[in-house]
């Protein structure tokens, strides 16, 4: 599992309430699937397992989305398939995990990439089922759109072929969780606070509704516009919940400043006010997130961030751009100073480090932690094969007996070390672990690792080690000959 993806997985995991199924969600089986897909132009299909926690969490939101679409008289259908009872369908559409959601347009499936909240599901299927960009001809039409769609993005360009207009259309074609339109007149543009060429984002969230604009001169490339849209689709500070998680981490802005605090704390109101003030200053550069320590489901995120609940309030910055990187403020740095320091590249990574166990060298598989990693793995006199793992990772657990047996094979060879490092407790600045398990070998005489991506069995592991170190028996004989000389 990708480490970045696993972080997102932690964010979206929670247990949903048990509610009655909606009659507006079609129940599909192998007997009626083809008929339903071919008989409706737009169908969103959820493949689920009854025992799946994430499926249970999604169910009420999925049902609500179906009900809303029905109320609006939409032609879009929402359906579900119990993949455990319809395994032929699950196999046909390559269902590898639950829930898997596919969108069928005229019978052709594409992967659902939207969020898990009701409004996000509705907005996504509407976007996919209609034109990429709609022309809004009147203020009344704009108001109607605002009433039906949580996020409306409105462009206004006097020159429809300008660079900014071209960038806008490209972004509209690639962003699925917002409704994109262009103003048909200056009057419509003005109703969205656009008094000159540019883009407005209108977010309708009850008391937290907001209209934000960006001028044409600032629309210089698609990445910049996507990041601006991501920032302003969210509140200045967004509380992490099951509904908001996908929207927080799923956009194009991959930098996050977390305020970790109990909402029940007496200092909460004052602290969140200061955090929000800073968030508004850095709105399009970093996403500001509130994490409530009192919410039980947030415990694993605290673990990921390396924050003890007893030591809160606290704050951390996380980047998911290329790989996972975490930062914590220096002593005395307030929210603004820390954010500035990070954005200017002055903040050092916050790397976890486990204490070295006294018996780290007692078994054939040597235990590495941050403090002894360089000494052992980068020892140029030895070939060192390291397993980077997570205790909760299923694939890592399956690998344990094979890795133990491999270590036993080379235990008498002084030139080969088989080791393991718990990457959830130890982070290394110069070694990036992007999946679990990650296997890397440092050949003798080299500080550059070789990644292993072959089959995870004893025979293949031995072949790999021997390629760089010679066979266990050959190395042992060579060592004995050297001692005799």
Swiss-Prot record:
Query: Under the GO molecular function aspect, what terms does this record hold?
Result: protein disulfide isomerase activity; protein-glutamine gamma-glutamyltransferase activity
Q: Where is this site: Lowers pKa of C-terminal Cys of second active site?
A: 456
Keywords per UniProt = Disulfide bond, Endoplasmic reticulum, Isomerase, Redox-active center, Repeat, Signal
Q: Motif Prevents secretion from ER — list its residue ranges.
A: 482-485
Residue limits of the Thioredoxin domain? 21-130, 342-470
Q: Which GO terms describe its cellular component?
A: endoplasmic reticulum; endoplasmic reticulum lumen
Q: Which reaction does it catalyse?
A: Catalyzes the rearrangement of -S-S- bonds in proteins
Q: List the disulfide bonds.
A: 52-55, 393-396
Task: Cite the position(s) of the site with description Contributes to redox potential value.
Answer: 394-395
By what name is this protein known? Answer: Protein disulfide-isomerase 1
Q: Which organism is it from?
A: Caenorhabditis elegans
Q: Lineage from the top down?
A: Eukaryota, Metazoa, Ecdysozoa, Nematoda, Chromadorea
Please state the gene responsible for encoding this protein: pdi-1
């Amino acid at each position: 599992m990708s480490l970045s993806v696993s972080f997102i997985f932690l964010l979206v995991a929670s247990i949903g309430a048990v509610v009655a199924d909606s009659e507006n969600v079609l129940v599909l089986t192998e007997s009626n699937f083809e008929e339903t897909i071919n008989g409706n132009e737009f169908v969103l299909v959820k493949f689920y397992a009854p025992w799946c926690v994430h499926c249970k969490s999604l169910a009420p939101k999925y049902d609500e989305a179906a009900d809303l679409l029905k109320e609006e008289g939409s032609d879009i259908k929402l359906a579900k398939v119990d993949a455990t009872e319809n395994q032929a369908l699950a196999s046909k559409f390559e269902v590898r995990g639950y829930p898997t959601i596919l969108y069928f347009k005229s019978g052709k499936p594409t992967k659902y990439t939207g969020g898990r909240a009701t409004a996000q599901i509705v907005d996504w299927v509407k976007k996919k089922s209609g034109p990429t960009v709609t022309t809004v001809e009147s203020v009344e039409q704009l108001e109607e759109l605002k009433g039906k769609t949580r996020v409306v993005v409105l462009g206004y360009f006097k020159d429809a072929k300008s660079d900014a207009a071209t960038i806008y259309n490209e972004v509209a074609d690639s962003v699925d969780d917002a409704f994109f339109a262009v103003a048909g007149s200056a009057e419509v543009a003005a109703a969205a606070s656009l008094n000159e060429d540019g883009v407005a984002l209108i977010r309708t969230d009850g008391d937290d509704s907001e209209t934000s604009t960006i001028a044409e001169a600032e629309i210089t490339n698609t990445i910049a516009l996507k990041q601006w849209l991501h920032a302003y689709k969210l509140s200045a500070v967004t509380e992490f919940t099951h509904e908001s998680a996908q929207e927080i981490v799923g956009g194009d802005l991959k930098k996050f400043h977390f305020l970790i605090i109990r909402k029940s704390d007496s200092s909460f109101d004052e602290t969140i006010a200061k955090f929000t003030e800073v968030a508004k200053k850095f709105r399009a550069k970093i996403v500001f997130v509130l994490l409530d320590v009192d919410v039980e489901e947030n415990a694993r995120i605290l673990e990921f961030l390396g924050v003890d609940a007893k030591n809160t309030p606290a704050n951390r910055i996380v980047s998911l751009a290329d790989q996972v990187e975490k930062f914590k403020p220096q002593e005395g740095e307030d929210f603004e100073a820390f954010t500035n320091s990070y954005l200017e590249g002055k903040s050092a990574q916050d790397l976890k480090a486990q204490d070295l166990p006294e018996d780290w060298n007692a078994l054939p598989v040597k235990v590495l932690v941050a403090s002894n990693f360089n000494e052992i793995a980068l020892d140029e006199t030895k070939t060192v094969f390291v397993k980077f793992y997570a205790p909760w990772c299923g694939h890592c657990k399956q690998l344990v007996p094979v890795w133990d047996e491999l270590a036993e094979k080379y235990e008498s060879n002084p030139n080969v070390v088989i080791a393991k490092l718990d990457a959830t407790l130890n982070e290394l600045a110069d070694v990036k672990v992007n999946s679990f398990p990650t296997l890397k070998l440092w050949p003798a005489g080299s500080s550059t690792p070789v990644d292993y991506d072959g089959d995870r069995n004893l025979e293949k592991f031995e072949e790999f080690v021997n390629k760089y170190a010679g066979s266990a028996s050959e190395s042992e004989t060579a060592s004995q000959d050297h001692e005799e000389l």
